[in-house]
Amino acid sequence: MPDLKDKRFSSQAICKILLAAHLISRDQARDLLKKETRVKHILYKQKISKKKNPVLNGKPETMISFIDVLLYLKIQRADQPIKRLDEDLIYKTLADAWKVPYRKIDPLELELNLVTGTISKSFAKKYLLLPLVIEEGKLIVATPDPFNFEAIKDVEMVSKLKVKPVVSTKSDVEKLINEFYGFRYSIT
C-alpha cells in the first residue's frame, strides 16, 4: 500500500501529473477532488464488508488511495474520451513523472524461488513488494510505491543485494503475491 502521507500520493499531486499528461481536464480534476472523501468512504465500507471479522483500525483517508478513487469512478480520458483511465496508464504516467521505470509484470518470466525465497509472504503483502529478477547484480522489485525506502532497505539487508524498484500496478503486485506465495505453500 502506498504511503498515503507521502505528498507524491496526494490527490492534488496525482491530479497535477494527470493534468500535465493531458489525461484529465481541469474540470475533471476539480470534480475528482470534490468526490474524493465520499468515494473513499464508499470504498472503505466495501473493503470492511468483504472481511469476515472487520477490524476498524484505520480511517478511509489512510486506507484507500486516490488511485483507488480514480479507478472506482471509471474516468474518461481527456485525450481520448472514448477510453477510460485505467490502472496501467495511471501508474505508467506516475512512474514517468517520478522518473522511476515502469514495468508490466509477465508472470511467465518470474522464477518461483526468487519471488518466494527472497522475502516472506507477510512482508511482501504488507509493503506490496514483489521480487522480479536479478539484473546486473541488482534485485529488481515491483511495487506501486517506489518511495518506501525503509522496506526497500530491509529487502537489501535480507537479500544482500542492491534493490532497484520499478513501478507496477497495485492490482498486479497483489495478484502475483497471492498466486506465487499461494502456489509455493500448496506444494510444500
Where are these regions (language model features)?
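Short, low-order "capping/linker" segments at domain edges
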Residues: 174-188
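Non-catalytic accessory regions
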Residues: 1-152, 158-162, 167, 171
